């Protein structure tokens, strides 16, 4: 089968299997896909992207917004550029198809240009690696593509995640004469594989009676979390990007509540998703006197301390509230109200220009999906924002890296534009620090090229402020901290935005930021919002109920 025919058959199979977006990165070995895309072989949205690393994180953002993306790259280092996004997708359980063009086997290990062993480059981070040899017939090819898509979405029983389809192409890499004449293609029969629904275990069997229970939702939390809370009376505590906020019913200030005196009385915790932000939460889940029930459909489940009493795939809500939990829930509500007042007083006594003040301003002034930098911004929202109810919130906490945050935000904006009802509509607001933005500055080109409905709030604390909230802030001298952890950048952000065709605004106070966010703008916009480092606030808010 000619290479372009092979590429066309793969694209038609991907389209038939529900892949929504194809991101194509230019190259010679991957060129058959370009010709096939130009001929209309893919029925979804196809987009050329210059940078493979940006394309990978653009796919991560699309997956976070509910799309099923595929990234096509050429052979060699182009494949390795996808590695950071593949790691994030793997740990965040996001479906992503990495379609990697390759040279035929006889050209590997003999000194041929741009040839390496790339078929297992992603190792254990890919759910599967499907190898397609050159000239493979389309009937068998469609079956292999079906298996790849099934593995990516976690069907029938696995965890969703990235899958590599490594395609060997022989010359010629251009359309044959028959292809150029538009000869009719044979239909591709793709096999759809359904995801198996887990068995629901009775709440009474898994959790039992409790007098002081909590439900804690981390990234990838079950959509049933709110139902469990309503039916059991257990207060629902949630990280910003767990997905639980979209359904409402969340008790804010989770870190303050758990770290306070009330946290000592907790006897049962139901954990759903992967909570990673809070040391008080981790300490609670490690306590031997607390019964921990983990709800997770897939291995490996989240149990960092090894303290889980029970792990279940899914859980039915209880038929009645649990024990004496009503009085406990009232105590938690009172503690939450007290925490809110004290946090407000604490911030009112400060400068009003910290990352935490900025987070509260963004939460008030915007109403669409949020993308939060995985370092300081997501922690600021977790600590002190009183409500994110009804909001779709995303953060690359799979590996908690700062790489690709702009590209991820563009992906969320594109995916949200395709499904406004699912994500609540509205302009996407991304909040990130200066190092995070600088690390992915080239992805501003993606934002401009896609005309993304996106506000990028640059919370500029003059370097890596996150480390000051950790033990390194006390262990290092000021000069040593700035040299090895801060890494402040001298960047003209207005010029940077202009260079990439992104509009620019500056907000020197949270009030100015709120005003700008309330003003609509076409296309992407960068809002430079300088903030002061205030590491002391993080500990003070965490301990505000002690």
Task: Write out the residue ranges for each language-model feature.
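Phosphate/pyrophosphate-binding active-site segments
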Residues: 1, 282-376, 501, 507-515, ...
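N-terminal cofactor/phosphate-binding cores enriched in small/glycine residues
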Residues: 2-87
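Active-site diphosphate/adenylate-binding microenvironment
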Residues: 7-11, 15, 28-37, 332-425
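Thiamine diphosphate
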Residues: 46, 88-89, 95-99, 106-119, ...
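Glycine-rich, anion-gripping cofactor-binding loops and their flanking helix/strand elements
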Residues: 64, 72-75, 80-81, 201-203, ...
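Glycine-rich, acidic loop regions that bind phosphate or pyrophosphate groups
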Residues: 100-148, 238-339, 447
